[in-house]
Amino acid sequence: MAWWKAWVEQEGVSVKGSSHFNPDPDAETLYKAMKGIGTNEQAIIDVLTKRSNVQRQQIAKSFKAQFGKDLTETLKSELSGKFERLIVALMYPPYRYEAKELHDAMKGLGTKEGVIIEILASRTKNQLREIMKAYEEDYGSTLEEDIQGDTSGYLERILVCLLQGCRDDVSGFVDPGLALQDAQDLHAAGEKILGTDEMKFITILCTRSATHLMRVFEEYEKIANKSIEDSIKSETHGSLEEAMLTVVKCTRNVHSYFAERLYYAMKGAGTLDGTLIRNIVSRSEIDLNLIKSQFQKMYGKTLSSMIMGDTSGYYKTALLNLVGTDL
């Protein structure tokens, strides 16, 4: 399933919220769970992981009205570690959460290029527009300015190009002649010359529609006798290679891309909790069920079983609630 179709599929939603919702008793339950000495973590999980994001925002308003406190700040003061990070992530409106993840990836020493690439390469034009709006409102600078200030070279160029959101034209029309020309241009920019014309790759990958790119990839393989992925791996390296490959992966199958991100967040020693939390939270009301299905096809195990083996405590319980049942 290509990435540009993923936002209209209700069967992909793993967190649908409560059908008989009333924010006031939920807010009271949360207040009691954090009142006095000790915290009832299970009560917090039972409320917040079983409500939609819109419902959580209403609970936060009720909490403020009833008890005069900010719910997110209260949660931060009562919880800690990975569990706190997950629960607080649930409280952000979706676009503000993704803006925060981008800001956090660039603040301080070093830049988490993988986070920026993941978000920019996998979102639609409308989503990127909302993320950019939230970013500027919350941090007082534009996302494009901060990316330009924090990255350089061809990586900066591909990230800024991705921000323009030119790939989600879903008209379905593909000009076969242009697709063939693009494939020939990519081949000429890489395999046929000593060195690589990176800007040709960036321009085609970031400005053509996803349906068009699928045809380009087919034509490219006929010309080069190798996949576009193999050519990118041989012609580029580092974060630029990662960015280009992510665009290709999301064009081919966005659910496979996110399944891969989740798998490698847990594979081997240690867990990339930031990747795990971000992708489960951000996809839970979009297409997480479809990602789960793809995960099982690709790795022969369920996402739930891998979470159970790789996490623990209330953190594990909350993640499993968000993921839902694996069939």
Curated annotation (Swiss-Prot):
Keyword match Calcium: yes
SMART domains: ANX
GO MF term list: actin filament binding; calcium ion binding; calcium-dependent phospholipid binding; phosphatidylinositol-3,4,5-trisphosphate binding; phosphatidylinositol-3,4-bisphosphate binding; phosphatidylinositol-4,5-bisphosphate binding; phosphatidylserine binding
Amino-acid positions noted as binding Ca(2+) in the UniProt annotation, renumbered to this chain: 266, 268, 270, 310
Keywords (A to Z) from UniProt: Annexin, Blood coagulation, Calcium, Calcium/phospholipid-binding, Hemostasis, Metal-binding, Repeat
Annexin repeats: 21-92, 93-164, 177-249, 253-324
Source organism superkingdom: Eukaryota
GO BP: blood coagulation; endosomal transport; endosome organization
Matches recorded under SUPFAM superfamilies: Annexin (SSF47874)
Record's GO cellular component terms: cytoplasm; cytosol; late endosome membrane; plasma membrane; sarcolemma; vesicle membrane
The UniProt record lists the keyword Repeat: yes
InterPro entries referenced in this protein's UniProt entry, alphabetically: Annexin, Annexin_repeat, Annexin_repeat_CS, Annexin_sf, ANX8
Function, in words: This protein is an anticoagulant protein that acts as an indirect inhibitor of the thromboplastin-specific complex, which is involved in the blood coagulation cascade.
Free-text domain note: A pair of annexin repeats may form one binding site for calcium and phospholipid.
Family: Belongs to the annexin family.
Protein name per the record: Annexin A8
